[in-house]
Amino acid sequence: VSELRENSQLVWLHDDLPDSRVGLERRALEDVETARKILHSQGYYDGTVRHHINWEAQPPEASITLRPGERYVMGPTKLRYERTGPAGEPVDKDLPESVRGIDFMENAPDTLEAFGLAKGSPAEAQTVLNAVTSVVTAMRKAGYPLAEQGKARYVIDRSTHTLEADVLIKTGPLLRMGPVLIKEENVRPADNPDAPGAPAVNEDYLNKLSPWIEGQYWNDDLLKEYRTTLQETGLFSAIDMKPARLSPEQAKAAGWTDRSLAEAG
């Protein structure tokens, strides 16, 4: 009810009466549609919404009546994975296990229960979407920085009052953390300190600040940590960091330095 009040045309425009009956009827019908969406988002797929306008009152009074019905719960969920990139090289076995990281696909869950969507829990739309987002987030911390959601199929079973989910995840390639790539633009020549542009960045210094060990499985959290570290140096007005899709040879041809993984400037 509170969510409907917050989004109700009748409530928001209470002191701004429409010029005609048609206008008030339109507002009421818009609120009916809003109420249906709210019921569905909370798992009440059989809920009904009706409106009534008392034209005898002055000014006319409109009311919305909601009958939620039985709340649906989660039925079976299924996670499927489509490899959309090369398998990638295995992690360096010489690295200590404590720093190798994780290959998500070695023990990839096949349901959404591992991501907070238990069978029998309320079938709330936002909870379902959060669970799917959590899969992608987890993959980006475990070797798959380009993972993304593919097609998803949600089925309402009215006989059992359950919601079933079948979600496809596109994995992208399995990647490891590499050295840091710095791409500088409008850099002032070292032999001309009076020239326009920014001063050159010490690549070795920035590479030493990276929190990962080269060769471990990709982890987005480490990239975020590195971004924070770079911001704290005060050397950059803005920082853009992303997984490099180029081989070292391609990176050099594109003008990147030998030490590459992130773009900063």
Predicted features by range, described:
Residues V1-E6, V11-G265:
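Periplasmic polypeptide-binding modules associated with outer-membrane biogenesis and secretion
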